[in-house]
Amino acid sequence: LRGLTLSVPKGEVHAIMGPNGSGKSTLAYILAGKPDYEVTEGSITWSGADLLEMAPDERAHAGVFLAFQYPIEIPGVASMTFLRTALNANRRARGHEELNTPDFIKLVRAKAESLNISMDMLKRPVNTGFSGGEKKRNEILQMALLEPRLAILDETDSGLDIDALRIVSQGVNQLANKDNAIVLVTHYQRLLNYIVPDYVHVMDAGRIIKTGGKELALELEERGYDWVSAEHQAASETRVAQEVS
């Protein structure tokens, strides 16, 4: 990432689009605090807190959630145990009482039903043997349970058929409200047919080079990304020429 500035207020949905290697997933990982990435300059502020001073678990407790493009399988860890541990860790961090087993099961059942997730699926280890669509729905189930204040979805539409995409999008739309923000990282406009963004940002070479409304996604679907890069390059050359003169 190089000189990237992005502001996502509560109550808004922002889509991040761009070609492969433009920095979209890097942005998602940095926001969530993935240890493999080093921030050498700049700052990240969310709800008055400096995220760069917080470990990944502290960011999660502060309401930051990342849905992975490729959710990993965790053999030997029961899905229900995983979900309850994550939920109660967040509740403790926010000063709330932990949910007992009956209340937890009731909550999970309601959330799972809204996402067309079978409770039988949750009897299996986390993501183990799940289809691509099941893994993505499981990510959204986690999001629905944790109720994050900043949800980052890294290419959640990748590998989904139309039915799975519709169900996952429905889950995201149920979460969206005036008290949280959602960042959608995607290659394709089709996700934005179901989750309508307030703003669409185009990334290239680690920078945001264009911002527009939902209509920008439609134009990108029709014309690709090259015209945006060319437009940005021309504008940059014009600025340099004006500074020299």
Segments and roles (model prediction):
Residues 43-59, 127:
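ABC ATPase NBD Q-loop/coupling interface
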Residues 17-19:
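The feature captures the beta-strand-to-loop junction immediately N-terminal to the Walker
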Residues 32:
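Helix-to-loop junction immediately C-terminal to a conserved catalytic motif
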Residues 203, 207-230:
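Conserved beta-strand-loop-alpha-helix hinge in the C-terminal portion
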Residues 165-178:
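Helical segment within the ABC ATPase nucleotide-binding domain
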